Structure formats: structure tokens, C-alpha cells
Amino acid sequence: MPISCKSRCGNRAALKRPKTGDALCKECFFAAFEAEIHHTISSSNLFRRGEKVAVAASGGKDSTVLAHVLKLLNERHDYGLDLVLLSIDEGITGYRDDSLETVKQNRDDYQMPLKILSYEELYGWTMDRIVAQIGRSNNCTFCGVFRRQALDRGAKLLGVDSIATGHNADDIAETVLMNILRGDTARLRRCTDIKTGGGEDSIPRVKPLKYSYEKEIVMYAHYKKLVYFSTECVFAPNAYRGHARAFLKDLEKVRPSVIMDIIYSGEQLRFKDTVKKPVRGICTRCGFVSSQQPCKACVLLEGLNRGLPKLGIGKKSKGDRMIAKQNQELALRERANLVKNDF
Amino acid sequence: MCSIGEDDFGDEGGTHAMVAGSVPSGIDLSPGECSKCDISSDELFQLNFRTPECRDCFLAYVRHKFRAALGAAKVLPRDAEVLLVVDGSAESLVLLDMLYYAQTQNTFKRLHCSARMVYLEDQPVQGRDPADLESLEALSKRYEAFEFYVITLGLPVGSLKLLKDYSPVAQESNELIQKLSQLRSLTSRQDYLQQQRKNLIASVAQKLHCSHVFNSSISVDLATQLLTSIALGRGGSAALDVALLDDRLAAGIKLLRPLKDLTEQEVQFYVHAQRLQPLLMASSRYGQELGDAASLQNLTSAFVANLQKNFSSTVSTVFRTGGKISESTHPEQAKCNHCQSALDVELSDTLLAIEYSRSVSEAGVRLNEAIEDPEIISKRRMKLNDELCHACSSIEADFKNGS
């Protein structure tokens, strides 16, 4: 017997919502999914009328759905937002070049301006060249650190009031688990925040999809026939996150509500007064947000430019020793040159 | 899609990676000279991160961990009455043996408290053979100084008996078993049973006039417990689930976990050094036989066991994370009727989001015609169960569906 839609709209149910277990028809699912995101945005006061918001767009399912839904809600509920797409080109052949084509498609479909910033122009390095230098291990460190800052740089360039990212509920639950697995209390504190940053000198980041299940995002994109790019990065996947992810997926199979429960748990965690809090400051070299001096991006870049790509990987003291050693060698060579010139 | 986020990078730099490495398990003792007291012995105890030592030096070290846990926090008042929960597992025997030793010391070093022990017979609930009375009696004989009580899980506290007066009665059913059978999921059953165990222990302690209860959880148990609590939505009270002192028991009784800093290897070595004999039936938890994927708890223990095998240092990181968190409460906050944890349901956006999802799913396309704002409906629903915490209301919801 066909199951009818839970909302009693008279249609047959087309899907079972992973989040609530309710059987819904397509139209009712769209309505519910969009209403939830609208509720998240309005109840958490993510945006204010007249603001310019950059949607961090990678071409993947999350950012595509985010761009689509934000545009739709902006018109439906008259948020009065000026939406722009912001993409980062890491310079990964066979991955980012293709996904950027998808973003360009989104730009045309949603009539939203698009700004693409590349690692090449910001740092003088593409990921392809970085990987050629450092190899397949630790390359994700460069990509991640640079991307975070690149988004800030892009946002500053575009003069936006906030950056909306496509982090979904699964991502957040996974991050809670991951931070517990490695005892990172600083990140555990803030990883469930729907809005981060936003002090005097930083641009806030918001996660309108915080309560949207990944499975529902995929369903939404599928039924709405949205164009998105779904290929894994050609470089190494992140084993650590993978571990937490696999665990979360197993948990979700047993009890789908576990994703929201973990987010709730993460929010309820309090820390002893003796636990150190990170201090957010500004990097003295580049002027972007950082909790250390100089910021990670500057250290990594210095390493690349000095020909010491491992500089920012591992302990700082190790990096300092590497610099000292290189300086010593350079000085020696300089002295040798002087001697030669005397003749 | 690249899933690397800013959270993947530590302040030390580099992606955090779980360092693969395993702890050798099993007991492999070789003869040699103790690196501490220079006396040669047949069996040297080589713990990870420690130099090989003789039996006496090893015992002094592990027993100190137990005393230090109690002493540093000053949680046990002088001459306290303590109830020791013995389940026959290696850990519980280690705790029993350590406590016994601490009491037989000379005046200067003696731990001043008087202790009783209780064995919770869970045979009817677990559906397995009753406890092996002979082993229990052997245990009682070895530690004669402690009174040994037995009670069956699910029976009223009035049925508490001294071991010598106890005879196992084959039980088909009791109230607890019936309750458990009404719960749909094993996750809820295990969670419910854990709360009921705690309640029963508290009643026994109260009956025996004990102000403190000793529980034998060790670090890996607490790492598992922390992740389980997080997965169940008990984040707010997770700190108490893994702390040395848990004061959520009825009548102000305090639950202590003095072995919380012990590792599995230390327990193994201690069992060997003292020739303890763990009871076989203690090896399985309720519902464990249904497989790893049967409940959140089973999955989490399997996950931690796997970590322990392949990334053993991660387990201690998880355990230490548990030591950094504290309970989210202030004194005047109401407590959950079921688990006594602080209630903070009303303030949570996440819980509102869950209810909101249900409301809008019901409304569907007719959302705009709805007479009442789904947010108001959601808030009203959240208030329906305002005497239970989020996790306990999940158990409650499971009941209704099952009956």
C-alpha cells in the first residue's frame, strides 16, 4: 500500500526524512527543509537587512544548496540581503578547475556575482606546486590553512558583512567527536557556534545549514535537480576526519537523531576554569585573524619561500631550529663568497 | 568535495593525526633486576612508559594511584562508610584488593573508612546462569573484613541479603524486565538500565548507611562513557559521568571512581601480581551479545576498543578530555527526574530545531496556511516534558512507542 504524505496534503510520500523519520511528498519536503533554514536564520539573527553576504562556494552539494536556498529565502521572506558567491581556486588540476565550472554555472543560474580568488595570486603558489614540494603527506595542512585565510581576504576585498559557509549538521557533529578524540578544548568550545568571529577586526562566519542533515541536503539537491560537483579531491583524503566520520555514520544508522544529540551535547559542554582559553588576535605580518604570532599561513608561506616546506608542520621549536640552521648556512656561504672576492 | 576544515589544524601546525601505535597486551614477564630497588626477581613488570620493576615496586606504584585519586581531591571524609560495588570483573577485584590493602596498613598509612561490598545479581535481566556462589564465597572469605551483600537487579531494596543468607532464585520476570521489554531500542534499554543500576546502588547504600559508593571504572571505561554520553545527548552531565566524584545519587550519596587513572595493562598486571580470579560471567554487558551495531553504546565501545588496539594514545586523550570538562549547571537549576542531571532543555536552540523539524514536517506545503506558528507549537511541545532532560525524554519517547 502506498504511504501517504505525513502532512495530509493528499499526495503520496516520495521519501522518508532522515531527520524526523516522517514520510513526505517532494513538495512538502521542500517546504519543510526551507522553513527550517529560514527558522535557523531568523531565530539566530544571522543576518541583518541591507547586509552584503558572501556565500563560500566550492561547487559541492552543501554550498550549492546553500546558495540556492539563501537566494530563495531572501526573495520569499524579503531579507534584503545582497548575496555574492566567493570561491577559492587552490590550483588543483583535475579537481578544482572542474568544480569551478559548476560554481560558474551556479552564478548564471542564480544571477549572483562571483568572485574567484586563487592561491596563485594570493600566495604565489598553487596546490599542485606545493604538493610537488612537500609530497602527499601534510599537503592538506597548506590547503586548509590557506583556504581559511583566502576566504577572509576575499570577504575583505568584496566588502561583505559576513561569510556564509555550507557546514551541515553532520559536519558539526563530526567536528565535536573529532575534537574530543584529540582533546582540543579550544575548538570544542567554538565548533558548535552558529556564528563565529565578528569582533572588531574579523568578518563573522555563519552556518545557516547547521541543523540540516547531509542526507537531506543531498535529497534536496537531487529532487530540485541542482547542479553540483561531487568528486573527491585528487590529493590525500584526511584520515583523521575520516575516522570520526565513519563512527558518526555508524551511529546514525542506529539512531538518526544522534547527529542533533551530539550537537546538543557539544553545546552543553562546559570547561573547568583551569582549561586554557585561546586568545584571538591579529597576525602582525599579514593582519588577518590568528591565535598565534605569526599566523599559520605566514609560517607555511615562509617555509615554502625559503625552500623549507616542513617549517610550519610540527612543533614551532623545530621550525625555529630549521630557520637558524638555514641562516647559518647562508651566512657561511656569504663568508665564503667574500673570501673568494678578495682574490 | 574537500572536507578539510579549519578544525583540522592544530596550533602546533599540521593536520592532527591519530598516531598509530598499539599497547602490547597480555602478560609477558621476564626475570631480571628491578630498576628501582635493584633487587633481582623472577618477574619484572614492564608497564608502557615505565622501566621494568619488581612486584613490590609495581604494587606500590599502582596502589599509590588509587590513594592519590582519593587523597588529592579530599573527597573521602575520615571514617566514611563506603559501599563497594563488586561485579566480579578484574577491575572490581583490583579495587577490592586495593581497598583491603589500604585498610590493613599501619595506623599512619591506613585509609580510614569502613567498607561493605555488594554484588548486583543481574541474571534475570541478562537471561543467563545465576552467579557462581562458590566464587563469591571464596571472595568473601579472602576479604573477610568486609561484609558481603547480594541483591538481584530489579527487586526492591528490601530483598538485600548477606551472602551467607542468600540463595539464588530462578526468576522469570520482575518489574525492571517488564519495563525493559517495553523499550523499543537497545540504546534506550541500556541507557535506562544504567540509570536503574545507579538508583539501586543508591538505595542499597542508603539502607546500609553508606555515604560513599566506590565504582571500579578505569580510564578506558570512562573514555567509552564520555563518548557514549555525548552520543546520547548527555553532554551537559557528561562531566559527572566520568569524574572522580558524581553526586547525582539519591539522598546525597556520592559515587566515587578511585580507579579512574588506571589503565587496562595495570589492571592486568595487578590481577596477575595478586593472583586475583575475575569471575567469568562478568565479562559481558547487557545487550552486548546483540552485536556492535545494535546500539549506540555497543558501537561506541567497539569504536574505543578499536582505538585502544590501533591508536592507543587516542584513548587516553579522550579520557583526559573528560577531565577538562565540568558540569553545566548552577545550583538553583532544576534536576531531571530520572537521572538527576541539571535541566537545560528550554534554553537550547538545537532542541527547538528538532521540535521545529517535526512541526514543519507535519505542516508540509500547508505551512503558510497554518493557523499557529510552528515555532509556538514546538515550544509548547518542549514544555510537555519539562521534568526530564533531553536524553531521558528520548527514553520516555521510546516507551510510548513500544507499548
From Swiss-Prot, chain A:
Record GO cellular component, one term: cytosolic tRNA wobble base thiouridylase complex
Entry keyword Transmembrane helix: no
Glycoprotein among keywords: no
Record-linked Pfam families: ATP_bind_3, zn-ribbon_14
The entry's keywords: Cytoplasm, RNA-binding, Transferase, tRNA processing, tRNA-binding
One annotated GO biological process: tRNA wobble uridine modification
Broad class of enzyme this protein falls into: transferase
Gene3D superfamilies in UniProt: HUPs
A GO MF term: tRNA binding
EC id: 2.7.7.-
Major location (coarse): cytoplasm
Superkingdom per UniProt: Eukaryota
Subcellular location: Cytoplasm
InterPro entries: CTU1-like_ATP-bd, CTU1_C, Ncs6/Tuc1/Ctu1, Rossmann-like_a/b/a_fold, TilS/TtcA_N, tRNA_thiolation_TtcA_Ctu1, UPF0021_CS
Pathway linked to the protein: tRNA modification; 5-methoxycarbonylmethyl-2-thiouridine-tRNA biosynthesis
The protein's role, per its UniProt record: Plays a central role in 2-thiolation of mcm(5)S(2)U at tRNA wobble positions of tRNA(Lys), tRNA(Glu) and tRNA(Gln). Directly binds tRNAs and probably acts by catalyzing adenylation of tRNAs, an intermediate required for 2-thiolation. It is unclear whether it acts as a sulfurtransferase that transfers sulfur from thiocarboxylated URM1 onto the uridine of tRNAs at wobble position.
Family: Belongs to the TtcA family. CTU1/NCS6/ATPBD3 subfamily.
UniProt-recorded name of the protein: Cytoplasmic tRNA 2-thiolation protein 1
Organism whose genome encodes this protein: Drosophila ananassae
From Swiss-Prot, chain B:
UniProt-listed Pfam families: CTU2
Subcellular location: Cytoplasm
Pathway(s) served: tRNA modification; 5-methoxycarbonylmethyl-2-thiouridine-tRNA biosynthesis
Entry keyword set: Cytoplasm, tRNA processing
Residues annotated as transmembrane: none
Domain of life of the organism encoding this protein: Eukaryota
GO MF annotation: an example: tRNA binding
Gene3D superfamilies associated with the record: HUPs
Role noted for this protein: Plays a central role in 2-thiolation of mcm(5)S(2)U at tRNA wobble positions of tRNA(Lys), tRNA(Glu) and tRNA(Gln). May act by forming a heterodimer with NCS6/CTU1 that ligates sulfur from thiocarboxylated URM1 onto the uridine of tRNAs at wobble position.
Protein name, per record: Cytoplasmic tRNA 2-thiolation protein 2
Species of the source: Drosophila ananassae (Fruit fly)
